[in-house]
């Protein structure tokens, strides 16, 4: 699929989610992927749903006064969690390419009275952020959606300060998917067909200039979560995939949390 077409369909898919709040991560699932009940208690209502695959904030070792940049910030959940840690002396910037998500995040920001959070409309391949801005970059199940992941990591490197940290959660492949799944629009929006092999993902981060790159956590999604997810059901219906075969695909996918440093 062409890069422009991919971005268009992802933007449209996530715009629909922003309007309906119909995402895969119910409160029960959010806790399964790393968000605690205590954390969720302190975010605005409407931000407490996630399209992610982990909690990058939990592993980012944020410090008071730091500037955090979230790539693909959605409704703002991770931004608000980060803001609670860095405090009023810190700053959090969320970037998302979907206008409806930016509107949703800004609304949530107003509801939560956050003075240290801002949301910017833009693409993660061309961040509307100055060089050497962030102490920490986080991202949650977004980079797999980009058709130009190499460029994303180069932009992350550019916008980080020297010594800045990268802490991202994302979906990677442990084995190649069938061509029919790779070409599926629903599978792309569902963070599946855009994913690359784990070794390739790490290689792209290192190629951008990051050092000390390591996978700090690797998990499989619960099979019942994948098979019963509304997006997964749409993929199964589109490609006429029975539940048993879908479970085999689930074994090809992992959620990883990756750490790196800008030297």
Predicted regions and their residues:
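Conserved alpha-helix/loop element of class I SAM-dependent methyltransferases that forms part
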Residues: 29-67, 71, 78-85
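A short acidic, Gly/Pro-enriched loop at the edge of an enzyme's catalytic core
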Residues: 64, 125-136
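A short glycine-rich, Lys/Arg-flanked "PGG" loop and its adjoining helix->strand segment in the class I
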Residues: 87, 150-165
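Conserved SAM/SAH-binding beta-strand->alpha-helix loop
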Residues: 98-100
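Conserved SAM-binding strand-loop segment of SAM-dependent methyltransferases
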Residues: 112-125
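Short, glycine-/aromatic-enriched active-site segment of Class I SAM-dependent methyltransferases
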Residues: 172-192
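Short alpha-helix
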Residues: 193-209
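C-terminal lobe and adjacent flexible extensions of AdoMet/dcAdoMet transferase-like proteins
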Residues: 208-263
